[in-house]
């Protein structure tokens, strides 16, 4: 009999579907802390699937999965969708959205004391400093 390793968080009804199909599962219930880690891992999995989507319909399906995981993370953390929307709108009003498609390749800052120099240097993996 073929056995496949899943080793991942699944939607609530998936295990029942397997049992109804006569499959034998090895499962366990995640602790609250482990569930949050698993949800974050699931978010990465679903984001990868968004990236791999090749049709409009599959993109919609994968975006719905991302939204479901985001909603589960928020619920787990005691955050409401209204909380998220309020912060999203505030950030959009202050920083803008992504509709213009601006992609910054590099930024040269003429002043060492600029607050952005310190900001970038605090995250060298994210913002590597380019030597000329």
Residue ranges and their predicted role:
Residues 1-132:
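Flexible "arm" and connector segments at domain edges
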């Amino acid at each position: 009999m073929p056995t496949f390793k899943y080793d991942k968080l699944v939607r609530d009804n998936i295990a029942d579907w397997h049992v109804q199909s006569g499959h034998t599962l090895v499962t366990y219930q995640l602790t609250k802390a482990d569930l949050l880690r698993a949800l974050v891992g699931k978010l990465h999995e679903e984001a990868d699937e968004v990236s791999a989507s090749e049709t409009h319909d599959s993109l919609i399906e994968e975006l719905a999965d991302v939204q479901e995981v985001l909603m589960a993370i928020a619920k787990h953390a005691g955050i409401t969708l209204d909380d998220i929307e309020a912060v999203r709108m505030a950030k959009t009003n202050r920083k803008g959205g992504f509709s213009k498609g601006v992609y910054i390749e590099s930024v040269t800052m003429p002043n060492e004391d600029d607050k952005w120099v310190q900001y970038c240097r605090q995250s060298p993996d994210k913002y590597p400093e380019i030597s000329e």
